[in-house]
From Swiss-Prot:
The lineage of its organism: Bacteria, Bacillati, Mycoplasmatota, Mycoplasmoidales, Mycoplasmoidaceae. Residues 175-198 have a biased composition (Polar residues). It comes from the Bacteria. This is Putative adhesin P1-like protein MPN_370. Residues 151-162 have a biased composition (Gly residues). Residues 47-76, 93-116, 128-214, 457-476 are annotated as: Disordered.
Length: 737
């Protein structure tokens, strides 16, 4: 019997994600509660160091629109903008065809990614510097001006774009005891004084003031947006800014030089690395765009080389090289770690290791926010290109299914999206217009895979007709099915084997027997007599309870009566669902008697089983008693036909005209559902002419109390029971009081 039960209720097909946490509901809340918030040495919360609202300057840090409205003079708990997003820090590594090795060679046509074994979530605040007078922070004292390269724009001759790691000025950090002194490492070109370590204001596009409530409540369990913000942090955590520690290709990007704080470096602050500039509640930092997506604004075109690494998924254009480059979204998910990205409506799901993470209302975020739609943030800059996912990324989704291993798989088709992009670009060009077929057809695939390509993999060739064609073999132009990982396969097979009913059922049975050993029977000869006695007691209790309930149960009306449970007679049972239920209950009652006999006789007649079966039988007989009483009451009524000029009677309590009070509402006859608007329902009405009641607007009520108005209820008072079948036909029956 146990084998049969296990075979019925346990499916041998398991989901891949049963190996990890179930992130649904409260479990996700628990996970978020323990996310290690790192930033400026403070937890992310009310103890975060903010600014004084009263004394904050109009362009002070933490506000782009002026001072806060708080007039209490207390310290504000608004986070600095870089504390809003979620980032991470790890050693920078290169990707070699899906396997990861530290990037130390001279010829490196790969793009830096992160070491998945050394990942830590952070709030992106590592480079956000408090005022130097605070002398409390020891994290990455790089000025905002240096970090963004803002001092090198506008005709600068340094040769580097804003945010280029080569162009960053290193902060000079001095530590005396527990006090830190930070200052810019190089003087400004037009001044002999060094730049201040703090910045005066934040760029407007980096200060999502309107999103501060969500940001502040990110760790609040009652915030409905916390899961959405968490996913934005995961997908929007841009890879760490590469610390280009050397002067040539032979010693750049060394993992040993990827340092993150003064604590790590102690004395050698020249190698201080900046954690990823991070995203601001989903917003990309333009300095990061310039650094990782090539010299987009400074040079007007993207380039991906070891000296100017580009990490992104740019829309391929036919007038430049090295365009199709995959975005590695902070978490360096290897093919076996992430896959099966599924989009349905506005929900997004993806596999992360053994987890299936699902979030809603994420596919179509606000313009400029990270998500499936990545666009340039600086709308005023004509050279700021859109980053793929294209305009409507959800249009590329073709569906998903569950394979034999229980994994969710999905199909994407970007051909149409890419052709639209190529067609638009071709029409804007001065050369012959391309048809859009020049781009290769992109095969359907299941997930994204971080891969590698040389910058020359994408080439453009001009045909004799002058039409430009794409000759591209770059794997970045395709969505690649994840590689099969042997360990994962073995894990799936092991779980499947473990949960096979033929193996699971005997194990459970054995464990059950070992857990509950049988009690010895000192006198087996008397055991049947003891069981028979208990059977008699059980049956007697059940019968007494059922009979008493049947005799005392009044007629039970619902408001409105439920789909044929009451009304009309069919033998001794109500018509419709009620009759079926009564018959089912009678069968169940018989089965209960049989089961209690078997249970008591063969299972040692435990006290727990005795109580359980007694309660079950009593409950079953109670329900049967209700229906029997209802049927008996209806049979006493005298049925006849009446005119169709009634008012609707809506009950607010149990109805029995002879025993209990009732209330009906005067309603216009025309409002009754005579045309099948409510098929299968019952309507109990009262004759409109018997008591001289005028059909009202539905706001009047008349209450009948049998203890006071019995005499007023004459034989002329007629109650009508109307039923509407599925075809809209009306069956009317009446009875007099």
């Amino acid at each position: 019997m146990l084998k049969l039960a296990v075979g019925i209720f346990i499916s041998p097909t398991l989901t891949r994600f049963s190996t990890g946490f179930n992130l649904a509901g409260s479990v996700l809340d628990q996970v978020l509660d323990y996310v290690p918030w790192i930033g400026n040495g403070h937890r992310y919360g009310n103890n975060h160091r903010g600014v004084d609202d009263i004394t904050a300057p109009k362009t002070g840090a933490g506000s782009s629109s002026g001072t806060s409205t708080n007039t209490s003079g207390s310290r504000s708990f608004l986070p600095t903008f870089s504390n809003v997003g979620v980032g991470l820090k790890a050693n920078v590594q290169g990707t070699l065809g899906g396997s990861q090795t530290t990037t130390t060679g001279k010829d490196i046509p790969k793009w830096p990614t992160l070491d998945p074994a050394n990942l830590q979530l952070w709030t992106g605040a590592g480079w956000r510097n408090d005022k130097a007078s605070n002398k409390q922070s020891d994290e990455n004292h790089t000025t905002f001006k240096s970090a963004t390269g803002s001092g090198q724009q506008g005709g600068s001759t340094t040769g580097g774009s804003a945010g280029n790691p080569d162009s960053l000025k290193q902060d000079k950090i001095s530590k005396s005891g527990q006090n830190l002194t930070t200052q810019d490492g190089a003087p400004q070109s037009n001044s002999t004084t060094e730049s201040a370590s703090n910045y005066d204001h934040l760029p407007p596009n980096l200060t999502p003031t309107s999103d501060w409530p969500n940001a502040l409540s990110f760790t609040n369990k009652n915030n409905a947006q916390r899961a959405q913000l968490f996913l934005r942090g995961l997908l929007g955590s841009i890879p760490v800014l590469v610390n280009r520690s050397g002067s040539d290709d032979s010693n750049k990007f060394q993992a040993t030089d990827q340092k993150w704080s003064y604590t790590d470096l102690k004395s050698d602050q020249t190698k201080l690395n900046l954690p990823a500039y991070g995203e601001v509640n989903g917003l990309l930092n333009p300095a990061l765009v310039e650094t990782y997506f090539g010299t987009t604004r400074a040079g007007g075109s993207g380039s991906n080389t070891t000296s100017s690494p580009g990490i992104g998924f740019k829309i391929p254009e036919q007038n430049n090289d090295s365009k199709a480059v995959l975005i590695t979204p902070g978490l360096a998910w290897t093919p076996q770690d992430v896959g099966n990205l599924v989009v349905s409506g506005t929900s997004l799901s993806f596999q992360l290791g053994g987890w299936l993470v699902t979030f809603t209302d994420f596919v179509k975020p606000r313009a400029g926010y990270l998500g499936l739609q990545l666009t340039g943030l600086d709308a005023s800059d004509a050279t700021q290109r859109a980053l793929i996912w294209a305009k409507r990324p959800w249009a590329a989704f073709r569906g998903s299914w569950v394979n034999r291993l229980g994994r969710v798989e999905s199909v994407w088709d970007l051909k149409g999206v890419w052709q639209d992009q190529a067609q638009a670009a071709a029409q804007a060009a001065t050369t012959a217009a391309a048809t859009g077929d020049a781009l290769p057809e992109h095969p359907n695939a299941l997930a994204y895979q971080i891969s590698s390509t040389d910058k020359d993999s994408y080439k453009a060739s001009t045909q004799s007709s002058g039409q430009t064609n794409s000759q591209n073999t770059s794997p970045y132009l395709h969505l690649i099915k994840p590689k099969k990982v042997e360990n994962t396969t073995q894990l799936d097979q092991g779980l499947k084997t473990c949960w096979t009913p033929t193996r699971f059922a005997p194990s459970c049975a054995k464990a059950l027997v070992q857990t509950i050993p049988p009690k010895p029977n000192p006198n087996p000869s008397k055991q049947p007599h003891r069981c028979l006695g208990r059977i008699v007691v059980t049956l007697a209790v059940c019968l007494v309870v059922g009979v008493l309930e049947e005799q005392t149960a009044p007629i039970r009306w619902t408001s409105p009566p439920l789909n044929g449970w009451v009304g009309g007679l069919w033998g001794n049972y109500p018509v419709g669902v009620g009759g079926i239920v009564v018959r089912i209950l009678k069968v169940c009652k018989t089965l209960l008697f049989i089961s209690i006999f078997i249970s008591i006789f063969f299972l040692n007649c435990s006290l727990t089983l005795f109580i359980w079966t007694t309660a079950s039988l009593a409950t079953g007989l109670t329900v049967v008693g209700h229906f029997t009483s209802t049927t008996t009451t209806l049979k006493r009524q005298q049925f006849s036909y009446t005119r169709p000029d009634e008012v609707a009677l809506r009950h607010t309590n149990a109805i029995n005209p002879r025993l209990t009070p009732w209330t009906y509402r005067n309603t216009s006859f025309s409002s009754l559902p005579l045309t099948g608007e409510n098929p299968g329902a019952w309507a109990l009405v009262r004759d409109n002419t018997a008591k001289g009641i005028t059909a009202g607007s539905g706001s009047q009520q008349t209450t009948y109390d049998p203890t006071r108005t019995e005499a007023a209820l004459t034989t002329a008072t007629t109650f009508v029971l109307r039923r509407y079948d599925l075809a809209g036909r009306c069956t009317t029956s009446t009875f007099r009081s």
